[in-house]
Design a protein with these regions (language model features):
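Active-site regions of metal-assisted phosphoester/phosphodiester hydrolases
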Residues: 1-74, 78, 86, 90, ...
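Short, surface-exposed acidic-centric catalytic microdomains
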Residues: 94
């Protein structure tokens, strides 16, 4: 084998390695997102939030059907999504933008990892209410291809800012630092909603250690805490009603809550 052939072979191996590797996405931030906003914070102190790990729209029957996901989330004013499929060479639009177009919502897609320079997968927020600004923070350590992050969305209500946080974390047994970082961010905002898939139940010791003392689990009466890993956590807001939809369109249930702003959060 000549040196040229060896170099060619090594370049092929390197290219295959890079093509198959998932890379984390850097921290990002942005300004207002108002396109398709159909509600105003001036009209009401009550709004509905939801959280849904959509499993790339693959249901328990093995079929991928984004229309089923849209039907589940269509009544939410703000919905946080996890495991959202991004773009690729043969898939020019991510699932979040397709859902936003179907439901006529504001949308932000926060990819958590890239594959061959394409945003392969991530989290997203769809909203009827305008978003004032946003930022996304990667969290470490990550394991394998499961790169993680959380996003913070500031929304300007007539009673002050409301912050919506969305995340998808690995199990605390794989490292508590990501969970700690998310909870520290949550604790900074007096009026905030933390949504997402934590891969841990609310009675997990790590969750108990890092959850702010004044936070409430809006879903505590909806499904036994021993099973549920999807959360709607509140600070400075009150849940007037909560409900869920069973797994089927995804391998996760959908959870939602109707919230009222506390005019003077502590």
């Amino acid at each position: 084998m000549t040196i040229a052939q060896l170099a060619w072979g090594l370049s092929i191996v390197a290219a295959l390695f890079l093509a198959g590797r998932a890379w984390p996405v850097k921290a990002r931030n942005g300004g207002s997102i108002v396109a398709n906003a159909s509600m105003s914070w001036e009209s009401s102190d009550v709004f509905t939030v939801g959280t849904y790990n959509i499993h790339r729209a693959r249901g328990l029957d093995g079929r991928k059907d984004l229309a089923r996901i849209a039907n589940v989330i269509r009544d939410a004013d703000i919905v946080a999504l996890q495991e959202v499929e991004g773009t690729s060479l043969f898939r020019p639009r991510d699932q979040a933008s397709r859902l936003a177009q179907r439901l006529k919502r504001c949308m932000h897609f926060a990819p958590t990892r890239k594959l061959i320079f394409f945003p392969q997968r991530g989290n997203a927020l769809l909203s009827r209410l305008p978003i004032a600004d946003w930022h996304t923070v990667p969290v470490f350590p990550s394991t394998g291809r499961a790169h993680r992050s959380f996003s913070v969305y500031r929304m300007a209500s007539r009673h002050g800012d409301v912050h919506i946080l969305n995340t998808h974390l690995s199990k605390p047994a794989e490292g508590e630092q990501p969970l700690k970082a998310v909870m520290q961010a949550f604790a900074r905002y007096p009026r905030a909603v933390l949504l997402g898939d934590f891969n841990a139940t609310s009675d997990d010791p790590a969750m108990r250690r890092h959850l702010p003392e004044d936070a409430t689990d809006a879903l505590s009466d909806v499904e036994p805490t021993q099973r549920r890993v999807d959360m709607i956590l509140l600070r400075g807001l009150t849940a007037e009603a909560v409900w869920s939809a069973p797994a089927g369109p995804s391998d996760h249930p959908y959870f939602a809550a109707r919230l009222r702003l506390d005019r003077r959060p502590s």
